């Protein structure tokens, strides 16, 4: 299963970072193994770091270390989306922000109207 971040438990309850088992929809449809994180660029925290869906940088680094080595992070900024065309095996980014694909020490961002093949993700 692809991992899911328990946002409420970490942000509101104060639990230490951990992953839950997800339903693996992205990988089963596209072959792309990634934990999807919405609100990747959140800035509503004022003096608190709420990037990475309210996890903040410190907890996000801890979460990354807990991911299996073959799992990437697909970060989706606020007011941004990504559409997957299963027939053409491609994805298109839309909206005001970017999507971030990160695996290990490698990271790449894609902005509005970027079109990528599934292979670009798989070769990452």
Q: Model-found features: residue ranges?
A:
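A structural signal for short, well-ordered beta-strand segments and their strand-loop junctions
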Residues: 35, 73-76
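A conserved C-terminal secondary-structure "cap"
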Residues: 85-124
């Amino acid at each position: 299963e692809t991992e899911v971040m328990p946002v409420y438990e970490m942000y509101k309850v104060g639990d230490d970072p951990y992953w839950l088992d997800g339903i693996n929809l992205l990988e089963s449809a596209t072959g792309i193994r990634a934990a999807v994180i919405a609100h990747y660029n959140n800035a509503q925290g004022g003096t608190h770091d709420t990037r990475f869906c309210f996890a903040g940088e410190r907890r996000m680094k801890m979460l990354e270390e807990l991911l299996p080595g073959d799992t990437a992070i697909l970060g989706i900024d606020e007011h941004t989306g990504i559409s997957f065309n299963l027939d053409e095996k491609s994805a298109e980014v839309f909206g005001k922000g970017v999507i971030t694909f990160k695996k290990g020490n490698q990271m790449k961002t894609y902005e509005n109207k970027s079109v990528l093949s599934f292979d670009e993700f798989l070769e990452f």
